[in-house]
Amino acid sequence: MIRKITGLLLLIFAMASSSMVRAQSAYYNYIDTAEMKIKKQNWLQAERYILMALKAEPANKNNSLLISNLATVQRNQKKYIEALKNYDLALAMTPKSVTLLKNRASLYLEIDSLSHAYMDYEKVTLLDREDIESRYYHGLIALRKGQIDVAKADFGDLLRINPYSPYTKEAQATLQKTLGNYEEAIEYYSDLIKMQETPSYHTLLNRAECYLEIEKLNEAETDIRHALAKAPSEAYLYVLRARLNKLRRLPGDMERDIQLAIKYGISREMALFFIK
């Protein structure tokens, strides 16, 4: 997936004093080439030309942005250690950059370092109190850590900033589901599905879980079926369908779905734990 890095490269171009300077500068020529490689998702070559640009002008004032782009290119290659080091370096140069903090936080999420992601998102919310995405993730991590009051505060701020944002809808749905308010959660998930051009299997999965909790089995079946059409190898969906079949007292169908869940990566013990 091409991440939002081209725009930052263009920002660097705009800061050049003139087109003649850019044409004569190896630094900007390397950046030009890196941008072309990024558009083609040739991450290895993009990394090479960004490194050449940094070597050409190691003291250039734009390098914090360029180093951030280098980190993102490395992240796309799953070079997580190098990427993290370069986000750290870029932030040492521009510690109050919201973009850099969000990029590093996103990487921390990707490598499941939730505490570090939480701290970066918290820094962003202090720098920009209207940043919806960061407040959403800050609240979501708080919820996962059991900090219900923090999550409620974050998600309440989302309602204040933009009650119609998909982040707000998903935040409220997740909160209500966690609190056991399944009817309310279903309403928020339904709003979110209406907002999505193509409903994600993840949203359908979550709403199906809520339907199962209140034993609306036909509705749960519909969501599970639609989710499986989008993600047929998602093991947990077969666990949900096994649970549905258990509630319908269909042990043969339940066992079939347990076997499918095992096939796609969930152990039998884990499947039975979720079905109970």
Residue spans for each PLM region:
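Structural marker of alpha-solenoid helical repeat scaffolds
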Residues: 56-59, 93, 127, 161, ...
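Helix-start (N-cap) detector for alpha-helical repeat units in TPR-like alpha-solenoids
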Residues: 27-28, 61-64, 98-99, 132-133, ...
